[in-house]
UniProtKB/Swiss-Prot annotation:
GO BP annotation list: regulation of carbohydrate metabolic process
Binding positions for Mg(2+) per the UniProt entry: 163, 204
Designated name of the protein: HPr kinase/phosphorylase
Highest taxon listed in the record's lineage: Bacteria
Miscellaneous information on this protein: Both phosphorylation and phosphorolysis are carried out by the same active site and suggest a common mechanism for both reactions.
Oligomer and partners: Homohexamer.
Keyword set, alphabetical order: ATP-binding, Carbohydrate metabolism, Kinase, Magnesium, Metal-binding, Multifunctional enzyme, Nucleotide-binding, Serine/threonine-protein kinase, Transferase
Length: 308
């Protein structure tokens, strides 16, 4: 199920502890577009849209531009930007006309924030956060962990043992992210997953019920989110014959997962096998292959040399 994320100015303010210097009563405004914009065209009089839906930033470039004009003209130009009703305006330490902006802001319901960051720092911090929050999200049924530092989502039919397997892996020192309902964001060709808010911090163990993970196993065994690099699909015995398993494993198998090509392993769930050990081995194999070493290729090379 695909859903679109929502983001409000208040979330950005709290996340980055921003200093709201005007109109703090209006931080419930919605940010509906990614990116932090520098309104060069608009300041020059080229109004491309009737409204601005993303954050506006004023810094040294805008200050240098305004230096050419009188205070009256600066006020008119800033007024035109405010008329476009952006959800939030941020100005940096090098913006020398903040006084005019703050005076104008009294007539509008647009929150104004002062920061010490440069525009480029904002792009790496605040804009990355906004992009994640506003990206298209899909709700996936699975269990998400970080195994040897690699984000792995366990999938399979209900009752195949995903949650129980997650507990085994955590006891081996790996990290839990979420169980059952996983929100997956697609950002720049990569997938990032986290637990859906209603199930965050909980895990369902068949026969025991719902458990609070951090209280049961420790908050240090959890992280909020991880980049997803591998999908591991657990297969029940009845389905084994329908799957064509790779015998040598010369290449990493991939599948389209949420319109992204991602490493994919089928692992048969058979009584007596340690599935957690096999998953650790799969992750090790993946890391070796992506670093340039291939066990299967070396094995085949040795067989060919011996003429077997």
């Amino acid at each position: 199920m695909e859903i679109r994320g929502k983001l409000f100015v208040s979330q950005v303010v709290r996340k980055f502890n921003l200093n709201v210097v005007a109109n703090s009563d209006y931080i419930d405004r919605e940010i509906s577009t990614t990116g932090i914009t520098r309104v060069g065209f608009e300041l020059a009089g080229e109004i491309l849209f009737k409204e601005i839906w993303n954050i506006v930033y004023f810094g040294s470039k805008e200050s240098n531009y305004f230096n050419k004009f009188s205070e009256t003209i600066i006020s008119k130009k800033l007024g035109k930007i405010l008329d476009l009703n952006p959800p939030l305006i941020i100005f940096g330490k090098n913006f020398k006309h903040a006084g005019i902006l703050l005076k104008l802001a009294e007539r509008y319901k647009i929150p104004i924030v002062e920061v010490k960051y440069s525009f480029y720092e904002l792009n790496f911090t605040i804009n990355s956060y906004i992009s994640q929050k506003l990206s298209h999200q899909s709700l996936v049924h699975g269990t998400l962990l970080s195994v040897f530092g690699i984000g792995v989502i366990l999938m399979g039919e209900s009752g195949v043992g995903k949650s129980e397997l997650a507990i085994e892996l955590v006891k081996k020192g790996h990290i839990f992210v979420g169980d059952d309902a996983i929100l997956v964001n697609r950002i720049g060709g990569n997938l990032y997953g986290r637990a859906e808010d209603s199930t965050k911090d909980f895990i369902e163990i068949r026969g025991l019920g719902i458990m609070n993970f951090s209280r049961s196993f420790g908050i240090e065994r959890m992280i909020e989110s991880t980049k997803i690099e591998i999908v591991i699909e657990l297969i029940k015995p009845a389905k084994h014959e329908k799957i064509k398993f790779e015998r040598f494993g010369r290449e990493i198998q991939h599948k389209e997962f949420l319109e992204t090509k991602i490493a994919h392993y089928y692992i048969p769930v058979i009584e007596g096998r340690s599935i957690s050990d096999i998953i650790e081995t799969a992750i090790t194999d993946y890391k070796l292959k992506t670093s340039g070493y291939n066990s299967a290729e070396e094995f085949i090379l040795q067989i060919n040399k011996k003429g077997i």
